[in-house]
């Protein structure tokens, strides 16, 4: 029987909508596969991580999209119920990410899940925009849905970020973190509009992995 000790050291804060559970789940399985000298693709590891997350009740869908994006990087649109990739186009280099991570924490609740299920139609509109390649529109539609259900009020802040150079911006996961993508010359301007007194501001540089996906610097 395989035995070992696992130590997790992550820079991704919990309860902020930054997909810490999916990132950790995929990383753990990749570490175990490596220790057992087994070669597994990101898709295989993501499917297994999603199955486990769904089985133990960590995620209603398994969050296959989050698991795969954390393992592989890049733009990923998936069918979580079928554990398949719908679209994964090349990522355009030259964009930076600015994260605003509020001090408050998201606490999962069954009531939120039920409210998202009731708003499935609005969610499908965001998916169709993404399938058509309209990523900014999809991000906005998804953000408006999450804000409505979770009670966030970021509309004015999002407008401010877009006015100062953000190519797109929106809530990460179920929040409360907010993410904005901007060209390198606009990253500082976007970051300057975020309320530093109410949360942490992080600038994340993206670089291409082999195959055109992205990885945090």
Identify the role of each PLM range.
Residues 132-217:
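Glycine-rich, charge-dense phosphate/pyrophosphate-binding loop(s)
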Residues 18-42, 71-73:
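DPxDG-like acidic metal-binding loop motif
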Residues 1-16, 34, 192-193, 205-217:
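ATP-binding N-lobe of GHMP and related small-molecule kinases
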Residues 70-71, 100-103, 172-173:
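Short beta-strand segments
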Residues 2-5, 32-49, 189-194:
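Phosphate-handling active-site elements
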Residues 91-153:
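Acyltransferase
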Residues 43-88, 158:
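Alpha/beta catalytic cores of group-transfer enzymes, especially the acyltransferase/condensing modules
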């Amino acid at each position: 029987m395989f035995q070992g000790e696992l130590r997790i050291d992550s820079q991704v804060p919990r309860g902020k909508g930054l997909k810490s559970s999916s990132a950790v789940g995929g990383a753990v399985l990749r570490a175990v596969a490596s220790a057992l000298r087994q070669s597994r693709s990101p898709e295989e590891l993501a499917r297994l991580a999603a199955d486990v997350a769904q089985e133990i009740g960590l995620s209603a869908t398994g969050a296959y999209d989050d698991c795969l994006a954390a393992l592989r990087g890049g733009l990923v649109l998936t069918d979580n119920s079928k554990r398949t990739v719908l679209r994964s186009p090349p990522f355009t280099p030259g964009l930076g990410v600015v994260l605003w991570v509020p001090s408050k924490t998201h606490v999962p609740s069954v009531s939120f899940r039920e409210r998202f299920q009731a708003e499935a139609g609005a969610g499908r509109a965001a998916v169709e925009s993404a399938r058509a390649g309209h990523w900014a529109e999809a991000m906005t539609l998804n953000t408006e849905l999450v804000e409505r259900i979770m009670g966030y009020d970021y509309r004015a802040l999002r407008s401010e970020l877009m006015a100062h150079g953000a190519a797109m911006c929106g809530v990460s996961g179920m929040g409360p973190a907010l993410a904005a993508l901007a060209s390198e010359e606009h990253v500082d301007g976007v970051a300057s509009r975020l309320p530093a007194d109410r949360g942490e501001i992080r600038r994340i540089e993206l670089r291409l992995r082999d195959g055109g996906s992205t990885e945090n610097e």
